[in-house]
């Protein structure tokens, strides 16, 4: 089968990745290695999110997506889930005003129905409304998100015939397809993350556990992306 018209090779490596998604793996292992609680690991991970977001701005990233909480995460222990949800609420309350001042647009991605608490939904809506006019970087935060769930939800509402019509039914239709997906802790799987959007994304696996993933690691991942030749189903010339 020949490639479609959209399967055209980009003949030159891009100077930088503008649209980046990160799977933040390793908070629990990081905490265990240090004799800390899992909650401590998640707190360290949350602090690292803020630091890498600011690095992404400096490095010319226009859209950054960082997995916060998946639909599968509800199956973890009640204690861990409660701690994660509480931390997420605190993060929105504390960080949104500062991120707004820095020109960050916040966009939460995922189902906003039960079991997500109403108070979390209200916080997400507040943060989105406050930062809606910002354009320095868009920070997509998948919460209660699953790639299969997103596709199923879109399919239920779909009455069109084209991919573009289908895309408009995704949780964040304005999101560009990530050019680069980074996963920490050495793992090499998508874990139900942005399944529609990552069809042609480049994948970079880093050995660092997420709390240890620093600016140098981010720069190294971006440099690896810049060395690659993206073919989109075509052949190298």
What is the role of each PLM region?
Residues 1-237:
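Flexible, compositionally biased loop and terminal segments
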């Amino acid at each position: 089968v020949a490639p479609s018209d959209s399967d055209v090779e980009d003949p030159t490596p891009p100077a930088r990745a503008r649209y980046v998604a990160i799977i933040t793996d390793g908070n629990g292992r990081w905490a265990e290695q240090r004799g800390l609680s899992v909650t401590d690991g998640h707190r360290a991970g949350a602090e690292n999110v803020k630091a890498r977001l600011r690095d992404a701005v400096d490095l010319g990233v226009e859209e950054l997506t960082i997995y916060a909480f998946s639909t599968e995460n509800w199956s973890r222990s009640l204690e861990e889930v409660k701690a994660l949800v509480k931390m997420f609420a605190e993060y929105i309350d504390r960080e949104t005003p500062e991120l707004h001042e820095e020109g960050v647009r916040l966009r939460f991605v995922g189902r906003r129905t039960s079991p997500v608490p109403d108070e979390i939904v209200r916080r997400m809506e507040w943060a989105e409304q406050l930062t809606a006019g910002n354009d320095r970087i868009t920070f997509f935060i998948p919460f209660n998100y699953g790639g299969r769930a997103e596709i199923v939800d879109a399919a239920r509402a779909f009455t069109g015939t084209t991919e573009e019509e289908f895309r408009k039914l995704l949780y964040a239709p304005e999101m560009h397809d990530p050019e680069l997906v980074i996963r920490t802790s050495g793992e090499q799987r998508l874990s139900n993350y942005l399944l529609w959007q990552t069809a042609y994304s480049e994948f970079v696996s880093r050995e660092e556990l997420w709390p240890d993933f620093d600016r140098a690691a981010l720069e190294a991942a971006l440099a690896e992306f810049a060395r690659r030749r993206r073919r989109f189903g075509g052949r190298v010339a």
